[in-house]
Design a protein with these regions (language model features):
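A short alpha-helical cap/connector motif
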Residues: 1-114, 118-142, 146-178
């Protein structure tokens, strides 16, 4: 399945389609409002290495209920659904502050959450706290781009030291917490 995802990524990298970007959260470090889908994939999508990590973690967790904050073009969603084809996945793109309560209502619990929708500390911490009410002892949260900025790294440190967290793993650009 991973080979199919990477074939799709390669195919989309060549696409002439232009995507209109909307700004949510800290946004992108790229100044463009419109860009070719290939450029968006290169700048915003999960890498093959991190996609493989998400795939293996979802499989290992046997995750049935997965929440993703920050869909972009859906590459990470494909890794998650490939690992767990029968899982219920809610993937949010855009204004997560408005969409998160509805997304949480659609899942009875959270087995895995991938946070990649905002690179600002305050919203990231708020989303983390909102999701805490839906965890169990085998839930895993994965945070992308924990070193995207000093602010994001400080948010990661607060999350890693939260009293509900039993294990935190700093993978430099990804952070994982277990409960």
């Amino acid at each position: 399945y991973i080979n199919e995802i990477e074939w799709y990524r390669d195919w989309q990298l060549q696409s002439p389609l232009i995507i209109k970007k909307s700004r949510h959260g800290a946004g992108s470090k790229l100044p463009y409002n419109e860009m070719p889908i290939g450029k968006l994939i290169r700048s915003s999508s999960v890498s093959p290495k991190h996609g493989g990590f998400l795939y293996r973690l979802a499989k290992w967790l046997n995750a049935k209920y997965i929440l993703e904050l920050g869909t972009s073009v859906g590459i990470s969603t494909m890794y998650l659904s490939g690992a767990q084809p029968h899982a219920k996945i809610v993937s949010l793109e855009g204004d997560c502050q408005r969409a998160l309560p509805t997304g949480l209502d659609r899942l009875p619990t959270l087995d895995m959450v991938f946070f990649d929708g905002n690179h600002s500390a305050e919203p990231t911490l708020r989303y983390f706290k909102q999701c805490l009410g839906h965890i169990h002892n085998n839930t895993a949260f994965v945070f992308d781009d924990i070193r995207w900025s000093n602010e994001m790294y400080r948010a990661w440190q607060v999350i890693a030291q939260h009293s509900s967290v039993t294990v935190s793993i700093d993978l430099f650009s990804l952070g994982v917490v277990l409960f």
